[in-house]
């Protein structure tokens, strides 16, 4: 993902960049997520925690015969007992609240360790051509097919679950659950997010849900590129964000999933260089479809 921005800003690298990565391009099949009418969320859905609540009680300690145990002064010995209320596993899925669905998903992300799931595929592709103003626009039109090929060849196998198990109710547009018998599927759509050149890759709705590019410096340094001017005109908008995760009821881990967004790259007015090459970029735009399927 972090090579994408550098590729777009250093257009002369496209042909050489296309030569790296796997020789065989792997196609993946994604399934559109259709939300039901009652899947939309509002603030009231997440006012209370979905984690199982605990109750405590002070009780007298008894011996094997049921007699109350006393101390040296004759006072009854007591202890604090902590018990959890009904867990999600004991509650019918059809009765889960939206907060409980989100809690179950976050816990599944945390529980699912690398190597526990089948290897999937991380894919990148252009969603439309690369465009720009002036002379650079015609160059971009020619290079778009090569960029598409470069992105495809840098799509890689993965057994990594995106996200960190920290998704919040306020990040969601909608959430729903489907009972499959031995598994259940949680589907979510996530709010869009726009970042500047110095963002935190774990911050914001999309950062918490999947992860973003973050600061552009890593991408620039990786390919030896830099901005001479106009760095502040760079923005990345993450849109069409969705998650589907199938979770095993017994283990609480993710067995299959799909994570998706389109990142809309904009360079408003900047001068970028790589090695001895420099390009003036004005209103450079590219939409990149990013998908992980496990």
Where are these regions (language model features)?
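Positively charged n-region of N-terminal signal peptides that target proteins for export
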Residues: 1-4, 8
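Repetitive helical segments and hydrophobic/amphipathic motifs
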Residues: 11-12
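Subset-of-secretome marker
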Residues: 24-27, 32-60, 66-69, 74-294
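C-terminal motif of bacterial Sec signal peptides marking the signal peptidase cleavage site
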Residues: 16-19
């Amino acid at each position: 993902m972090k090579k994408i921005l550098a590729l777009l800003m250093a257009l002369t690298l496209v042909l050489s960049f296309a030569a790296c990565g796997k020789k065989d391009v792997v196609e993946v099949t994604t399934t559109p997520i259709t939300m039901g009418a009652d899947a939309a969320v509002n603030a009231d859905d997440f006012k209370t925690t979905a984690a199982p609540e605990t109750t405590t009680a002070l009780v007298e300690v008894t011996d094997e015969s049921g007699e109350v145990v006393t101390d040296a002064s004759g006072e009854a010995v007591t202890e604090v007992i902590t018990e959890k209320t009904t867990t999600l596993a004991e509650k019918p899925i059809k009765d889960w609240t939206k907060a409980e669905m989100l809690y179950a998903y976050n816990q599944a992300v945390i529980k699912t360790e690398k190597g526990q799931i089948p290897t999937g595929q991380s894919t990148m592709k252009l969603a439309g051509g690369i465009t720009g103003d002036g002379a650079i626009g015609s160059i971009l039109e020619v290079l778009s097919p090569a960029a598409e090929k470069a992105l495809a060849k840098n799509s890689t196998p993965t057994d990594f679950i995106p996200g960190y198990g920290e998704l919040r109710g306020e990040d969601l547009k909608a959430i729903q659950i489907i009972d499959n018998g031995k598994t259940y599927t949680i589907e979510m759509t996530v709010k869009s997010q726009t970042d500047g050149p110095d963002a935190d890759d774990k911050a914001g709705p999309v950062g918490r849900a999947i992860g973003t590019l973050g600061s552009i410096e890593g991408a620039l340094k990786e390919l030896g590129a830099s901005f001479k001017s106009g760095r502040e005109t760079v923005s990345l908008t993450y849109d069409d964000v969705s998650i589907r995760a199938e979770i095993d009821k017994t283990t609480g881990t993710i067995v299959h999933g799909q994570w998706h967004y389109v990142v809309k790259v904009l360079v408003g007015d900047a001068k970028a260089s790589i090695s001895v090459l420099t390009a003036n970029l004005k209103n450079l735009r590219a939409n990149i479809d990013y998908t992980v399927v496990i």
